Amino acid sequence: MVKTRFAPSPTGYLHIGGARTALFSWAFARKQGGKFVLRIEDTDLERSTQQSVQAILDGMAWLGLDYDEGPYYQMQRLNRYQEVAEQLLTQGLAYQCYASREELDALREQQRLAGLKPRYDGRWRDSRQTPPAGVKPVVRLKTPQHGYVVFDDLVKGKISVANHELDDLVLLRSDGTPTYNFGVVLDDLDMGITHVIRGDDHVNNTPRQINILKALGAAIPQYAHVPMILGADGERLSKRHGAVSVMHYRDQGYLPEALINYLARLGWSHGDEEIFSREQLVEWFDLAAISRSPAKFNPEKLTWLNQHYLKMADDARLVELVMPFLLERNYPLPATENLLKIVNLLKDRASTIEELADASAYFFRTIEPPEELRTQYFTAEIRPVLEYLVDRLAQIEWKRETIHHEIKQTVSSHNLKFPSLAMPLRVMVTGEAQTPAIDAVLELLGKEETLHRLRGRMEIFPG
């Protein structure tokens, strides 16, 4: 059975690159009818935090990336790492190294000055020296000194690395905690991971991890290293490109299905399909379709996708999502029925839930029109026409159809074109020049509030 995993370190939030890796691993497992595992690699005691763990769990939940096992925590498996390290020591496949940090720093400096690649020189590999008193050793793997590590990467193709280019990597630190390479190998082995899907910044780790597996006599999983994500300028993605946490996008009013759709298209494609559901992603997903070239992060494309999903979203769901944004702005919440109508009216004009909240402002408070709009539309000539319309509106049943009829009748009786009246009316009521159809806006605003705003605005007309 296919089994994949996502194994983040809890040293920050779930960022775009990590979320894409999780998505690819999740989609492949679902496509193959396999299992997806979540594992928290928390052995970096100085940087790992419970807050980061929660941020990762929240991000996964929001994206809908459900896992079949986990979350597992490396720090709960320390005995296992120490047990296997002891086994390798007993078999002569690993050794204890007592070299101090100062010694290793001096060695690297000598190698640098000599123009050599910095690497451990194996000074304790076959040493019969008496261990220094009071020094806790690290445990190093006896890396083969001849031959090659060869593996077929499911994205990059065949990769071959000479063993003489690899030094004897540390398996256990002096405090008994595993290094990344040792911990991840044992975790994948014990959890039955068949396919390791991860960023290509881990390619150089793979030969080292394969050598550990060979020392253990274990089966080698299949590897798929996905290309990194770049900013539009070709530089590695960072915060200045908008590469913030997944939850930041939620807080800005993006929908999870939009982010899933966008992340899937970062380095993977299915023909020319730009928009697809989670179910279609699972149906179509193929590791062979992942590009070997880096993907470029385009915030505008993500926003475009989000706009599409907003238009398609259920109004009741959008009401639930927009409410926190309205409360944050101290807007008085109307009845749910009215809020449903407001959302339905405005959602085609918004790119995010946050924009939807901002666009609805004139339904909840009076907005002063900018000077340029007042100068353009509040003229002495149009004032008597508006006064006539206000008198007519005060007498009608408040429905969109009757509102539209009165505006149209007023335009006709005064020999005007529709925009000549609709635009001043729009600016008077909303403070903006661009809104949905003015009759729809007035209906939702309500008769009392509409007349109150129109009569109040008459005072600022010239003449």
Swiss-Prot record:
It is an enzyme of class 6 (ligase). GO terms for molecular function: ATP binding; glutamate-tRNA ligase activity; tRNA binding; zinc ion binding. Its EC number is 6.1.1.17. One of its GO terms (biological process) is glutamyl-tRNA aminoacylation. GO terms for cellular component: cytosol. The keyword Ligase applies. Keywords: Aminoacyl-tRNA synthetase, ATP-binding, Cytoplasm, Ligase, Nucleotide-binding, Protein biosynthesis. A motif ('KMSKS' region) lies at residues 236-240. It comes from the Bacteria. It catalyses: tRNA(Glu) + L-glutamate + ATP = L-glutamyl-tRNA(Glu) + AMP + diphosphate. Catalyzes the attachment of glutamate to tRNA(Glu) in a two-step reaction: glutamate is first activated by ATP to form Glu-AMP and then transferred to the acceptor end of tRNA(Glu). Belongs to the class-I aminoacyl-tRNA synthetase family. Glutamate--tRNA ligase type 1 subfamily. This is Glutamate--tRNA ligase. It comes from Nitrosomonas europaea (strain ATCC 19718 / CIP 103999 / KCTC 2705 / NBRC 14298). The gene is gltX.
